[in-house]
Amino acid sequence: MVARRWRMWKVVGSSVIFHYAAMRITKPNRATHTYRQRLCAPPARVFPLLCPVRETEWAADWLPDLVISSSGIAERDCVFITPDKPGKAIWYIISYKPEDWFVEMLRIVPKVTACRLEIQLTPNGDECFADITYSHTSIGAAGDEFVASFTADSYRKFMQAWEAELNHFLKTGSRLGHDNAP
C-alpha cells in the first residue's frame, strides 16, 4: 500500500510550494517469543545485572563498544552499541523501573531488524522468575531471514543458555567456564 503525504518544500513570497512524496506501508514480518527463566536469587540481586555494563560480569561474549549513560549503568534513555551481524546493534532503554523490577529496550540493527525486549522480574521466595519477551520485526531482506530463523525452539535454547550463565554467576560470582580465570 502507498500512502501520500505533503511536505512543505519552500515559501515564495506569499505562496507555499509543496513537494509530493510517497511512503510505503506494509504489514510487519514479526516474530515474538516469551520465556520464563527461574533465577536463583531475589529480584533485588538480579535486576542490577540486567545492564549493558554489569552484563559483562556474567555473559560470555558480551562487550558493548559504547555505553552512553549519565550514571554509568543502566537507566532510562541509556544508549549502547554492540557488535552484530552484519554490523552494529543500537540499543535504547525506553523504560527502566527498578521499583517494579521491569526494563524495556529497543534494539535496532539497521536494514535488518527492529526489536523490543521486555524483562519483568517476579519474586519467588529467595529466587525470582524473569519473563523475557523479544519481538523482532524485519526491516529488510536480511531481517526476513532472521525473523524466519527466530523460532520458538531457537529462542528457548537462547534463553536456557542465558539462564544457565546468569544462575552460574549468581551462585559462584564468576562467568560460566571462567571459574579459574584471573
What do these predicted ranges mean?
Residues 5-72:
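Hydrophobic ligand-binding cavity/cleft-lining segments
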Residues 28-30, 84, 112, 125:
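Short coil/turn motifs at beta-sheet boundaries
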Residues 32-34, 87-91, 112-118:
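Short, surface-exposed coil-to-beta transition loops
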Residues 40-44, 95-99, 120-129:
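A short, structured loop/turn motif at beta-sheet edges
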Residues 44-47, 160, 164:
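Amphipathic alpha-helical segments that line or abut small-molecule/effector binding pockets
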Residues 54-55, 66-110, 161, 165-180:
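Glycine-rich portal/gate segments that line the openings of hydrophobic small-molecule binding cavities
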Residues 107-161, 177-179:
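Beta-strand/loop substructures that line and gate deep hydrophobic ligand-binding cavities in soluble
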